[in-house]
Amino acid sequence: MAPRGFSCLLLLTSEIDLPVKRRA
């Protein structure tokens, strides 16, 4: 598994997940 791809995906999911949790 590529570290760059994983960190990029993790960053994207965390950025999308945080606002959703705050709104919920």
Swiss-Prot record:
One of its GO terms (cellular component) is nucleus. Residues 5-12 are annotated as: Sufficient to interact with MPP8. GO terms for molecular function: G protein-coupled receptor binding; identical protein binding; receptor antagonist activity; signaling receptor binding. Expressed in testis, seminal plasma and sperm (at protein level). Higher seminal plasma levels are associated with normospermia than with oligospermia, asthenospermia or oligoasthenospermia (at protein level). Higher sperm levels are associated with normospermia than with asthenospermia (at protein level). Expressed in retinal epithelial cells (at protein level). Expressed in the heart, skeletal muscle, kidney and liver. Lesser but significant expression is observed in the brain and the gastrointestinal tract. Residues 3-19 are annotated as: Sufficient for neuroprotective activity. Residues 9-11, 19-20 are annotated as: Required for secretion. Changing residue 13 to A: Abolishes neuroprotective activity. Keywords: Apoptosis, Cell projection, Cilium, Cytoplasm, Flagellum, Mitochondrion, Nucleus, Secreted. Changing residue 14 to G: Potentiates neuroprotective activity. Increased inhibition of amyloid-beta protein 40 fibril formation. Reduced levels of amyloid-beta 42 protein. Affects fiber formation with BAX with fewer fibers running in parallel. The keyword Cytoplasm applies. Changing residue 8 to P: Abolishes neuroprotective activity and interaction with BAX and BID. Abolishes BID-induced caspase activation and mitochondrial release of SMAC. Greatly reduced interaction with BIM. Abolishes BIM-induced caspase activation and apoptosis. Changing residue 9 to R: Abolishes binding to BAX. Abolishes secretion. Plays a role as a neuroprotective factor. Protects against neuronal cell death induced by multiple different familial Alzheimer disease genes and amyloid-beta proteins in Alzheimer disease. Mediates its neuroprotective effect by interacting with a receptor complex composed of IL6ST/GP130, IL27RA/WSX1 and CNTFR. Also acts as a ligand for G-protein coupled receptors FPR2/FPRL1 and FPR3/FPRL2. Inhibits amyloid-beta protein 40 fibril formation. Also inhibits amyloid-beta protein 42 fibril formation. Belongs to the humanin family. Largely unstructured in aqueous solution. PANTHER family: HUMANIN-LIKE 4, HUMANIN-RELATED. This is Humanin. It comes from Homo sapiens. The gene is MT-RNR2.
